[in-house]
Amino acid sequence: MRISIFGLGYVGAVCAGCLSARGHEVVGVDISSTKIDLINNGKSPIVEPGLEELLQKGISTGKLRGTTDFAEAIRATDLSMICVGTPSKKNGDLELDYIESVCREIGYVLRDKATRHTIVVRSTVLPGTVANVVIPILEDCSGKKAGVDFGVAVNPEFLRESTAIKDYDLPPMTVIGEFDKASGDVLQSLYEELDAPIIRKDIAVAEMIKYTCNVWHATKVTFANEIGNIAKAVGVDGREVMDVVCQDKALNLSQYYMRPGFAFGGSCLPKDVRALTYRAGSLDVEAPLLNSLMRSNTSQVQNAFDMVASYDARKVALLGLSFKAGTDDLRESPLVELAEMLIGKGFDLSIFDSNVEYARVHGANKDYIESKIPHVSSLLNSDFDQVINDSDVIILGNRDERFRALANKTPEGKRVIDLVGFMANATSEDGRAEGICW
């Protein structure tokens, strides 16, 4: 394929080297004549192991060349990759000047180009950037229509400096955000020889995936550091602790607990988070990330309440009261917290939980629920159909399988709030079911 790459920094230079090495005809484009001279002489503009050899091979075989002429590069290629920087502004927002400038240059050339051209955003941009910035500029400057006259896609990169060549050749996955199927097909053809799954999504999803991955990496580093700091303060080697923690691939390093949904609860997690952060504080160990966990958890309960309150309805069915399906443990259940908030604001609440029978609740479990909702026995109803029929809003609170059907076929005249992910799609067919994170 004939490819132009705009921006020859860490991402663009690596892409130029790797794509040309795989036989594609690559034109590297940059406003810096110094970078272009380096590329055309087989020299790398950045320090990256193995890159210079790839660039030399591309130049010697005629598969790679550099230019400062944007228009010539676009006319000579079928696909353009935008790899320019998106640095932070002082307020933390993204600086999109480079993206906007490149899009204008591409758009002006597309105005007179007869063949279909595909524009791929490789730069890291926030969700909505392509839809609200990139495409409008391209359409305005070209006078053409995205998805009809030219293609648009997002292709987030997962390259780490110092291992970028290996990361390109052996990616964990290839993510394609496509504006239209034809654009996705063109981009997929570049990566089919790589031994990695190709995942095609909407553009905004692909944009968000990149940020989620990077923020997750930052979170892991911060988490490990805070655990290490606390461990050291109590006389323990944090490396030894995390080495064992990372050996658990079933829970600790897995998809488990990595699904958006409702707050955590139960007799262990809240108690242990509070205990560890209290100990850290007593030892004057700063743990901002760990200290934020309970606040964030409470915020998610508030989000659920706000969803209920946004409807013009007062009769609410809460399906599930224990902190998870298959147990009667009510201690620190976020559903108890939600029920308490709803009652406090005057909602007419009815609760169904097949595992919670008030006459059989005892000990610490009974003490907890009575301290939170003293009249809980009058709210519990074992008649599932009656609870549903008497409500205006139905909250799916845990993963009891009998609740699933309500997420995908909302009873007539009612609203459903899904806290657990039963909805098959982000929006229900009738528009009357809504997920807390989707």
Swiss-Prot record:
It comes from the Bacteria. GDP-alpha-D-mannuronate binds at residues 161, 210, 214, 217, 225, 256-257, 259, 262, 265, 324. Belongs to the UDP-glucose/GDP-mannose dehydrogenase family. PANTHER family: GDP-MANNOSE 6-DEHYDROGENASE, UDP-GLUCOSE 6-DEHYDROGENASE TUAD. Keywords: Alginate biosynthesis, NAD, Oxidoreductase. NAD(+) binds at residues 10-11, 30, 35, 86, 124, 271, 331. InterPro entries: 6-PGluconate_DH-like_C_sf, GDPman_DH, NAD(P)-bd_dom_sf, UDP-Glc/GDP-Man, UDP-Glc/GDP-Man_DH_C, UDP-Glc/GDP-Man_DH_C_sf, UDP-Glc/GDP-Man_DH_dimer, UDP-Glc/GDP-Man_DH_N. Pfam families: UDPG_MGDP_dh (PF00984), UDPG_MGDP_dh_C (PF03720), UDPG_MGDP_dh_N (PF03721). Its EC number is 1.1.1.132. It catalyses: GDP-alpha-D-mannose + 2 NAD(+) + H2O = GDP-alpha-D-mannuronate + 2 NADH + 3 H(+). It is an enzyme of class 1 (oxidoreductase). This is GDP-mannose 6-dehydrogenase. Catalyzes the oxidation of guanosine diphospho-D-mannose (GDP-D-mannose) to GDP-D-mannuronic acid, a precursor for alginate polymerization. The alginate layer causes a mucoid phenotype and provides a protective barrier against host immune defenses and antibiotics. SMART domains: UDPG_MGDP_dh_C. GO terms for biological process: alginic acid biosynthetic process. It comes from Pseudomonas syringae pv. syringae. GO terms for molecular function: GDP-mannose 6-dehydrogenase activity; NAD binding. Pathway: Glycan biosynthesis; alginate biosynthesis. The active site is at residue 268.
